[in-house]
Amino acid sequence: MSTGTPFLSTADIAHILQWRGLGPCLRGLMEALRADFMRWEDFDKSARVAHHSPVGVIELMPISDGRTYAFKYVNGHPGNTALGLSTVMAFGGLASVTTGEPQLISELTLCTALRTAATSVLAASVLARPDSRCMALIGNGAQSEF
């Protein structure tokens, strides 16, 4: 019997970052990403499902490795700043493929920013020249303006 689906909030993630430290967290994310990229073929990758409207977009991004099923819901609404809201917000879920039982619900706005940073470092470690000392990033995600 389930004891309830855990929810990971922005405050929970901030607490983990303070407790563990940003560097160790990013290194852990980078290694998890590296491990997942090494098993790329194991994932059933589906195209994102998008709903476009005059005021923004809402996207659903599903993926599964046959053991777990995950999704990310993310929006992009440029006019939200006039309402005192973020222009980009995200959350997601993780479930068992075997039982369908939800295993985790999480905010993913902050998580996506952390994932982007870890992916950038991972890509640079693989693609940069060995003598490189700096890197420039041009982004078009939550940190950018519409």
Feature map (PLM): residue ranges:
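Glycine-rich adenosine-cofactor-binding loop
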Residues: 120, 131-146
